[in-house]
Each structure stands twice: as C-alpha cells, then as structure tokens.
Amino acid sequence: MTPLKISTEQMIVLHGFFAEAAAVGEDELAGITGCDTEVEVQEIRATALSDFSERGLCLSDDLVAGVMGRLEGRVPGTISLVLEPEDALLWARLAGGDDPLGAFVLLASTLLQGVTDALGGVLDGDAAFEGARLVEEPELAMLVATHAPSDTIVFSTQLRIDARDEVLTAVSHLLVEWKYLAQVMSALSAAHH
C-alpha cells in the first residue's frame, strides 16, 4: 500500500469540513434534547485502517457505545459516532423518553446525517446514511467488523458536545476506501477555495 500522505493544508480543509458538517445537525439536536447543543471539532486524524491500532484517533481501548451505519452514494463507506457508555447514556437522557438506547441512536444518527449531507453537498451527488444501529464493542473491533480493505482510510474526528451544561467527548469515524480518497480530497479542496 502507498503510504498515506495528507498535507497540512488538506488537514486544515478536512477540519473545516467536519466543523461545518457537525454544525449542520446542531439545530436538530437542540430540537431533540430541548436545549442548545454545540458540537466542536477538537482534533482530526486520517489513518489507514491497517495502521489504526497504532496511529488512529481512538476514544478508548475499552468498550464504547456507538452508532454505526453505511454511507451510500458517490463515495460509499461506513460512518460511526462513539462515546463512553456513561456519556452515551447521559446524552440520551437529555432527549427524555422511556427508551435511552433509541434516543442515543437518534441523537448520533442526527449528527452523522449532518456529516453525510455535507459530504453529499461537496461531492455534488447523493449521499445517504443508512442502517444506523447501536454497537457496543471496542472501536478497533467495530471498524474491523466492517470488512473494509486494510488500505481504507479512517477519518477520525474528536468532538466536544455541549448540551444543557454537560460536556461530552465523542469520536466520529468515516471510512473511505483508498480508491475514493483522491475524489474526496479534490472535492473538499474545491469546496474550500
């Protein structure tokens, strides 16, 4: 596999994209929880799946609570959002109701749909987030379970979610196969300029 080389300028573009994408879902998240919600990108890292255990941006080596689904459209892939189980439950309780697991899936799916919509916008094509499901396992196991090729690029974004005086840390993972990387980076760079 060719070593992953993403320039500083490209990382800045990626950071800007994910910050804008996360902001897309803030109003919907506020509607679900009944309080202002701010999502801030704190760090982003791009790593080949084969190197993720050594170099990837990971919330925890232990069990995490995540929502994972397929990214369909011009650039197919997988997208997920993970939190510590206690934080996932706390976030879900902000939404109220009798089904905290369902609330967590709804909240995470809303945030991931914002990323999907933003990606569809820069790729000038359809993008859909489908098959959202709750996953509880270590992040590496979650990513490997996708059966993506080892050269798949994992764009990991550490997020700070502020809602109702609670601050939660989450990590989003977007898996894009190597063969689509140039297309994604070109579209993001064009949208940035």
Predicted regions and their residues:
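Composition-driven recognition of glycine/serine/threonine/acidic- and proline-rich low-complexity segments
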Residues: 2-193
